[in-house]
Structures are given as structure tokens and as C-alpha cells.
Amino acid sequence: MGVAIRDILADCKETLTWDDLSGIAALDAHNALYQFLSIIRQPDGTPLMNGAGRITSHLSGILFRTVNFLEKGIRPVFVFDGKPPEFKQETINERREHRARADEAWKTALREGDMEEAYKQASASARIDSHTIASSRELLDLLGIPWVQAPSEGEAQAAYMARQGKVTYAVSQDYDSLLFGSPVLVRNLTVSGRRKTRGRTITVNPERIVLSSFLDRLGVTREQLVKIGILVGTDFNPGIRGVGGKTALKIVRNGEFESVIAEKQPDFNPAPIRDFFLNPPVTDDYTLEWRTPDVEGVVEMLCGRYDFSEERVRSALAKVSVKATQKTLDAWF
């Protein structure tokens, strides 16, 4: 879900081409995996699976999107969530219940023969489990792509790496990265391209938001942006009913944040959430190293255990090999 500040971002988004995106991209791994699991499905909403019934949509997404990244001069690093803060538990429970309702709605739509509704509800029912994480990391290792284990929120770690200059930008569909202080956020990187939605095909392009320009345009500081986020709602609190981005911006600019919270939610203490956004748990215990893919290892995993087409897997990996030979291996990996 992320923080609900879309309505004050309209003039701050820059549509990009792939040529604008070369560099090191720190991806919110859980966010990317949810995108893969939601989108990579059959027309009736059924996820891709192997013969044993193991879901493989996320592995397909990692393989083909990563190859696409490398072809375009983007070196990805996947940042995985660690332990969530205690005040996120309510949101986690709500999301679990939402996925369960969506799963039931998917089954109902299938029985009624409504394939469009079935696909929609199936996408909303996507879930990540321990096998999803373990298999994703295994594939990344075989592809030679680094991944980082965050102590807590992956977006916070990615934003920290961007602030330290270790990566070029953070990648997520959510806007939390801005509250966590990422200098640059890129959206739609894992979902860009032509997609079918509501019976029609649309083109989704990557977009970039530069934090300093965003703050200047709004006339606020990052701490004030966090206050805006708290007012409209984040992953850690529901926000104040009826308060959208524009109203929250006015409240914060007028110095009324504390008084509005005291009036509307007298039992709510925003300080722990504010402090978490401004000083989240992060780590320097990681290494960013891109290696040439272990082609036979990838084939053994995806084709031998997950029933992927060997021809498609080898063809995808060959694109990376061809790209690497056009540069030097050292320059690429």
C-alpha cells in the first residue's frame, strides 16, 4: 500500500525511457515480488506453477525482468525486508484478511465465468511465503545478482543505500522511499511495458521522483513530509479520515500537525512512526558484486525443478552473455 500522497505528486513525476535508467537500482524485493506474483498469471488468474503445484510466477519475473535490466545497462540489487516494527502488525493483519477475501472472490468469479473479475481478484490474493523468499534468493545467486537483507523495512535500507551513494536510485511502487529519504525514487520499473487492464492494453512507463525537487515544490522539509504521510496514512497508521494529501500539506504548512492529531486522534502518538521514518534500522553489512550468471545452475533450477522451458531460459541468458561481450566483463559485472 505505502503512504497515500499520490495527489500531491502529480507535478513532480518525470516519465523516463530505459535509456535514462542506467546505473545501480536498489529494488524493494518484496514490492517487486508482489508485482510479479500479481501480474504474471494466466487469463483466469491462476499463477504460473510447476507440475508439483509450486508457484513460479516470481521466478519468471526475476529471470526475465533481470535480463531486461542488464540489457538496458541497469545493475539491480534486491533488498529484502527484515523484522517489521511492532506498529506495522495491524497493517499486516489487515492485508492478510484482504488477501483471504480476494481469494474467495476469485473462486466465486471463476464459478460465475467472469474471467476479468477472476484475474483482478486473483492478483489481489497474491502472497509471499518463506519458499517464495528462499527460491528468489537462490535464483538471484545463480544469476549473479546481489541481494541485501535489511534489518527491518527494505525500502528504508534501499533509501539509505541511495543516500550513501552506493546505488543510483531506489525502486518501488510505493512512495515510502521518499519519506525514508531516498534522493531518487523510480516507479514502474518492474511493471513497465504493455499491460492489459480492464479489458484494454495500456503502456506503463518508468517514472522518476527527485526528493529535493519534490520538497522544494511543496515548500516543506523531509520531516514535514513525514508528518504529511502520517496524516494521510502509512503502512504503520491508518491516517485521519477525510484528510488527503492536499489537506495534510496545508495542515503541516500551517504548523497545525500536533493540534490536529490531538483533536482527531487523541490516543495516537505519532512520534514512534515519525522517528522510524527519519531514523530506521539499516545496515552496512552487505557487498554489491555482480557476477556472470551460472547458466547451467539456472537451467538446473528453473528447468529441472520448476519445469521452465530450457529453450526460453537459455535464450534469455544468452542475451546477457551477448551484452557482456559487447563491453568487457569487468565493466559489465
Curated annotation (Swiss-Prot):
Residue numbers spanned by region Interaction with PCNA: 325-333
GO function term, MF aspect, one: 5'-3' exonuclease activity
Residues covered by region (I-domain): 117-255
Pfam families: XPG_I, XPG_N
Entry EC no(s): 3.1.-.-
Free-text remark on how the cofactor is bound: Binds 2 magnesium ions per subunit. They probably participate in the reaction catalyzed by the enzyme. May bind an additional third magnesium ion after substrate binding.
Record family assignment: Belongs to the XPG/RAD2 endonuclease family. FEN1 subfamily.
SMART domains: HhH2 (SM00279), XPGI (SM00484), XPGN (SM00485)
PANTHER family, A to Z: FLAP ENDONUCLEASE 1, FLAP ENDONUCLEASE FAMILY MEMBER
Name of the protein described by the UniProt record: Flap endonuclease 1
Residues at which Mg(2+) 2 binds: 174, 176, 235
Top-level taxonomic group: Archaea
Region annotation (N-domain) ranges: 1-99
Binding site for Mg(2+) 1: 28, 81, 153, 155
Sorted UniProt keywords: DNA damage, DNA repair, DNA replication, Endonuclease, Exonuclease, Hydrolase, Magnesium, Metal-binding, Nuclease
Gene Ontology BP annotations: DNA repair; DNA replication, removal of RNA primer
Naturally occurring in which organism (per UniProt): Methanoculleus marisnigri (strain ATCC 35101 / DSM 1498 / JR1)
Assembly behavior: Interacts with PCNA. PCNA stimulates the nuclease activity without altering cleavage specificity.
Cofactor names: Mg(2+)
HAMAP family, A to Z: Fen
Major enzyme class: hydrolase
Lineage: Archaea, Methanobacteriati, Methanobacteriota, Stenosarchaea group, Methanomicrobia
InterPro entries per record: 5-3_exonuclease_C_sf, Flap_endonuc, Flap_endonuc_arc, HhH2, PIN-like_dom_sf, XPG-I_dom, XPG/Rad2, XPG_CS
Record's function text: Structure-specific nuclease with 5'-flap endonuclease and 5'-3' exonuclease activities involved in DNA replication and repair. During DNA replication, cleaves the 5'-overhanging flap structure that is generated by displacement synthesis when DNA polymerase encounters the 5'-end of a downstream Okazaki fragment. Binds the unpaired 3'-DNA end and kinks the DNA to facilitate 5' cleavage specificity. Cleaves one nucleotide into the double-stranded DNA from the junction in flap DNA, leaving a nick for ligation. Also involved in the base excision repair (BER) pathway.
